[in-house]
């Protein structure tokens, strides 16, 4: 599998996103790319710079995005996800529209760093297509319109991280329905559960008091799978507005995992949750 972590700066929020993203990727032994998309610089547009002849300090003058990549590299080392080596600008490779660094492979998965410049949504979509990623892990945008655009525009699964605190003991809220993506979400939840030693709540919500055959079968399948894997869990069948029920059940101490939501329900859920 291939995971992409998109970071936007060097603040604590991005550090937490890196930490949870690396833990999840490690659980899947997935190749991992950390991508920063910065403002477009004149140097990259003109293509007149030679990476091999530039020192890091010179590059930082023109490409502050490299400071972000170096910061991410140091966080990876601090958390034990990257080798104990220096961030060497000579290991950067300039390609069409992107600059990348592949770190020495010390585990059974590969880690890379990527710098892109320009429009966030457009460049993120290009990177997703370039890497053929299974999932994108990123912070929840502060603007609802951008969240909507990202959810609709990117052709991959997306894990929005909002207000993650690495010091909390999280539980997992697994939202189960009859969508095609549910089984994948259930499998993903077991891997994350093992990484965070987190109990799973399997939740199926119907808008009425009646649960259709598809919902019941999906709920039963999830229970059987979790039992077979040996993950501690509890399951619930609840009636009501799905978004409101999800928000009430999630509280502030759950990692939420679901398949691809219908319409804008997932977006409402993100902005309604803590």
Model-derived features: positions:
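Gly/Ser-rich helix-loop-strand patches that form or flank binding pockets
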Residues: 13, 18-20, 25, 113-166, ...
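Conserved active-site histidine-acidic residue motif and adjacent donor-binding/catalytic loop
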Residues: 116-121, 238-244
């Amino acid at each position: 599998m291939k995971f992409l972590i998109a970071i936007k700066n060097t603040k604590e929020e991005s550090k937490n996103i890196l930490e949870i993203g690396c833990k999840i990727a490690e659980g899947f032994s997935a190749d991992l790319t950390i991508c920063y998309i910065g403002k477009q610089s004149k140097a990259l547009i003109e293509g007149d710079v030679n990476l091999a002849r530039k020192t890091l300090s010179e590059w930082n003058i023109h490409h502050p995005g490299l400071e972000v990549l170096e910061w991410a590299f140091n966080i990876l080392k601090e958390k034990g996800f990257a080798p104990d080596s220096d961030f060497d600008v000579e290991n950067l490779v300039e390609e069409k529209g992107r600059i990348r660094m592949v770190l020495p492979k010390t585990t059974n998965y590969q880690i890379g760093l990527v710098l892109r410049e320009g429009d966030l949504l457009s460049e993120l979509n290009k990177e997703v297509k370039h890497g053929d990623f299974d999932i994108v892990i990123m912070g929840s945008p502060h603007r609802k319109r951008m969240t909507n655009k990202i959810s609709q525009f990117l052709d991959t699964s997306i894990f929005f991280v909002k207000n993650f605190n690495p010091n909390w003991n999280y539980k997992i809220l697994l939202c189960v329905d009859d969508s095609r993506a549910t089984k994948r979400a259930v499998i993903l939840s077991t891997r994350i559960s093992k990484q965070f030693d987190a109990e799973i709540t399997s939740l199926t919500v119907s808008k009425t008091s009646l649960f259709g055959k598809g919902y019941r079968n999906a709920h039963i399948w999830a229970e059987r799978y979790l039992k077979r894997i040996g993950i501690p869990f509890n399951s619930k069948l609840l009636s009501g507005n799905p978004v409101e029920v999800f928000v009430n059940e999630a509280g502030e101490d759950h990692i939420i995992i679901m398949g691809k939501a219908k319409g804008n329900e997932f977006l409402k859920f993100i902005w309604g949750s803590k």
